[in-house]
Structure formats: C-alpha cells, structure tokens
Amino acid sequence: ITGEYTPLEAKLLDLALVLHAEHGGGNNSTFTTHVVTSSGTDTYSAIAAALGSLKGPRHGGANIKVVRMFEDMKNSINTKDEDAVAGYLTALLNREAFDKAGLIYGIGHAVYSESDPRAGLLMDCAASLAAEKGCEEEYALYSLVARLAPEIIAKKRKMYKGVSANVDFYSGLIYRMLDLPCELYTPIFAMARIVGWSAHRLEELQNAGKIIRPAYIGVKPIQQYLPIEDR
C-alpha cells in the first residue's frame, strides 16, 4: 500500500464500503447487536459482540474464503479449460477439494436466489478495475465460475433454490486488485457495517422494552438416557 490510488480505485473502495454498511436486521452480526443490546449492556459490548459474529468465515470472512478458493483452483487445475473448472467445482461440492466443506464460496445467499443486487454493482466495476490493473484473465475466471456454479449446484442438489454470485464473490477480488492484504478484508467490512450496527442498536434502545429471548428447539436427535454405570 503506497498511499497512491486512481479515481477508479477510490470509487470502488467507496462503493464497497457503502454496499457493506447495512443489510437489514436479520444478518448474523446485526441480529447479534439487537440481542445483546436488549440485555441492557453498553455500546462497546454490543459492537464487540457484533464483531465476534462478523469474524466468522460464514459471515464477514466469506470473501477471504473466496479468494483462497480461487488460489487453490489456480494451483490445482488448468483454469483456461472450462471442463477442468467444472470438474473442480463439482469436487468442491463433493468435499474433495479445497477445505472439503462442500461449498462453492461466494455462490448463494440466505435471502437472495435470482441475484444479489450488491454483487451486480461490484461485478460491473470489477470488470473496469481488472482492465485497469491487467487482471482480465482472473476476472474472466471469476465470470466463468459465476456462470458454471449455479448449473453444477442445480445438478447436485435434490432440493434446489436458485443461487447466484453474492457480494462476497466479487468484494474479495476487488480488494485483491487493490493490493489489500486478506487480513484487512474483515476489518474493512466492520468499518462499513458499524454504521448499520449503530443504527440497529439505536432502534432497539428506542423501541424495545424486553430482552430478546427466542424459544429454542434442539437440532440434535433425542437420545435415550444411559446410566453412568452403563456408559
């Protein structure tokens, strides 16, 4: 990081911050903010709890997973071969590649199915940045995966909800082209989302009167009690 940047680089970082600033009250870290705020705790504790949620790779750390998945892909196959890319994506779903989690990172969203509107904005700008940075081949690979992944997931899953590239799919690519280290991706997300967390905390303070205490149903199958002497 030299401190020098082009107008396009500044525009994309600004866009990424705006798109990550708020995304409703149901996402994990913002819901955490509501829950912790309802206990009556202070602002610092509520934001610290939200940060703990955002740190998770299924939430704020997802774009790091995307970048590392693509690094593994480039080290494992000929990424100019569409069949090889399709095979790698299938291997991901079969838990045979990368971290063997059975996921194609950056594809699919808990809310969006047809498209993530944030991803669409980043995708268009990422193309311009790739041209400026000489990263057209890498952008083409991302575009190929964005096209192939929904088709491969549809073939693999019996119950299928439409999927598409999400905001994490392109944000990691943009940060990488901006020469930002992976260790800063989640802190940048936090810098933006603290705006949303703060707004939701104020909403909870002004409108709620009771502690949030949802009912809980265990997801683990019921097991018969086994006396200690028989264990």
Where are these regions (language model features)?
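Non-transmembrane, aqueous-exposed alpha-helical and coiled segments at domain scale
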Residues: 1-231
